[in-house]
Amino acid sequence: MNTLKLKDEDIQDAFPEIWKYLEDPDVTDLDFNCGNIWQSKVSSIPTRVENAFLTESYWEKFSALVGKSVNCNFNPQEHTAMADTQTLRITCLHKSQSKSGLTNVNIRKSHGGLRISREMALENGY
């Protein structure tokens, strides 16, 4: 399994259709599985994205780009491709390994800074 760094701009430029679901600072995850897109936010439970018009072939193209960017063939033998940007962690699972028979993609936001300071942790009893 290879993991290399990408730039956020690489994703924004190549896949603006995905980026629009990640722009909201409240969004934490975007998942494509079983043919559905799910968006998770800090303030609510995961919700299905309606009328996204992003097909299985679109996600396969996205996964192939992620695989290529990390020097992974992304095929049944190399069935997982993982990449990081400054703010995203991307994991793609090949359809040959998926129970649904479709490519699975998870895009998780990761912030560079600490969300909880030492003082905040002590104050709240963490």
Regions found by a protein language model. Give the residues of each.
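N-terminal anchoring/assembly modules that precede and organize ATP-driven motor systems
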Residues: 1-50
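P-loop NTP-binding catalytic core
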Residues: 44-126
